[in-house]
Amino acid sequence: MSTRQEILRATERLIRRKGLSRVTTKQIAQEVGFAEGTLFNHFRDKSDLFGAVLVENLPPLMEISTSDRAGQGTVGANLREIALAAIKFFDKVVPLAASVFADIELRTQHRAALRRSKGGPHHLFEHLAKYVAAEQSLGRIQPQVDPLGVAVLLLAPCFHWVFIKRANGQNLFKITDAEFVNLTVRTLEHAIRSEIRKLS
């Protein structure tokens, strides 16, 4: 594990244990066992570090939704796998993001950092849209379907599902994540087929 990854994991542990507002760079350095200055060899400032923690698990999720998997398995199975991975990602990120967004200064700095890096959560939607477009090129999804629309209709419910569970502290719907994903993907597939019939 690289030094940067060790710092990110230590920061995440502390945020979950103490809350973001109570975490200092000195505490992070002590947690990971490095000099405090080491943190700033890898991150511009505290907000840059916290922002990196937010997107730490995004690359694996991006890999699952890559266009390279087009043509493998079934489209429905692929969308289910992507949705389950998204739920796991959102479940980890939502509490951290809530802490950042609740702090005006950190939120402003985080947004500035995203603009500098040209990063942001929209890339996840774009990545999934590319997968859908790749399936269209193989004839496995009809060309009338809007790729970005599919991405939004799959990922947005996953985020809201996690948000509701986190906000209430329990699963009020009494179904598992997998059952929710099956319900969402089946509904999405039905909606797509209906729209195709309407356009044809």
Regions found by a protein language model. Give the residues of each.
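Helix-turn-helix
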Residues: 6, 14-48, 52-56
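Short secondary-structure transition hinges
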Residues: 88-127
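Amphipathic alpha-helical linker/stalk segments
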Residues: 54-82
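Short coil/turn segments at alpha/beta junctions that flank glycine-rich nucleotide-binding fingerprints
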Residues: 17-21, 93, 138
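Short, structured helix-loop boundary elements
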Residues: 4-5, 25, 47, 72, ...
